[in-house]
Amino acid sequence: MIYNGPGRLAPGDIDEPVIREPSDAIVRVTTGSICTSDLHIRAGAVPRAVPGIAVGHEFVGVVESIGSGVSNIKIGDRVAVNCETYCGECYFCRHGWVNNCTDPNGGWALGCRIDGGQAEKARIPFADNCLTPIPDDVSDEAALLTGDLLSTGYWAADIGEIEERDTVAVVGAGPTGICCAMMARAMGAGRIVLIDVDRTRLDFAMNHGYGDVVVDPSSEDADAVIEDLTEGRGADVVMEVAGGKDSLRTAWTVARPNAVVVIVAMYEEDQVLPLPEMYGKNLVFKTGGVDGCHCAEIMRMISEGRIDATPLITHRFPFSRIEEAYDLFSQRRDGVMKIAVTMDRRCSGV
């Protein structure tokens, strides 16, 4: 799928990817997905996105060729691709802030500034850092969300400074919010509260054990519910994943004083923080994007059965029908959460 400028995303042809740097690898895509960030690109809300590139940063595949400097990955490996590519050597990478890698091919490059994974093949810079081998006991679908949504959840839970038995509120019960909830639980949260106005998504989350309490703020007072759960304190950690004006307000109002509020969402409009109202809460806000450099640990968690994101994959399409998949995903029809898009051999050059 080629981004041709705001509002224009369509199938098209790209050049066959080739090794450009010794640290590169070429991955033949086997399964990919559509991310809400792809919709933001289509809407023209990502200024850094380069017209003419193939989008897509959620995918797994098989290594087809490697550069002379690649040592940890070999041809034929099944791999999950990290949504963030990073050199590992610049100031930001050395501190673990790989989203801000200063290399031209670093940070959010795939599917934004260079060709991504909604194509038959993709060039992956810094392959040793950015490709994670998939164990034999992990399927492509089980590994599919490793490089993006599960990495986002891991990052959000990590910088949220979750302590054992904390009450963690996640605003937004979509796929990213659920991955944040999964990782919060894995890092010791005592109670997960999912907040969303979409009852279908709240029911999905509860039916699969991703939350302990769900709140629909269109019919319930989220502040009051969480105060009742926490003896009047509020949530210890809040993750704002929904990306709207109302959801941002909910995030800081349900937080207890001195809580950490992690802004995971990507906003399409400026937001306002009413500082006079907030005065005295002493909140700490931490904002995205994800420093996605924990894929090896996440893959271990999947292999060991500590996390399972496969229930999120509710629909499957061949790549030849990806436009239908985009329509379903963007319109949130038929209870869709995530879509697995499998590469079929009828596709050529896209």
Segments (PLM) and residue ranges:
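Conserved acidic E/D residue at the C-terminus of a beta-strand in Rossmann-like folds
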Residues: 196, 265, 289
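Mid-domain Rossmann-like dinucleotide-binding core that forms the NAD(H)/NADP(H) cofactor-binding site
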Residues: 136-219
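Glycine-rich beta-strand-centered segment in the early N-terminal region that forms part
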Residues: 15-32, 45-94, 135-138
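Glycine-rich cofactor phosphate-binding loops and adjacent beta1-alpha1 units
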Residues: 160-161, 165, 187, 203-284, ...
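Rossmann-fold dehydrogenase core element
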Residues: 260-262, 272-312
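C-terminal hydrophobic helical "lid"/dimerization subdomain
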Residues: 220, 225, 237, 249-253, ...
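Cysteine-cluster motifs in flexible loop/terminal segments that predominantly coordinate metals
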Residues: 35, 72, 82-132, 136
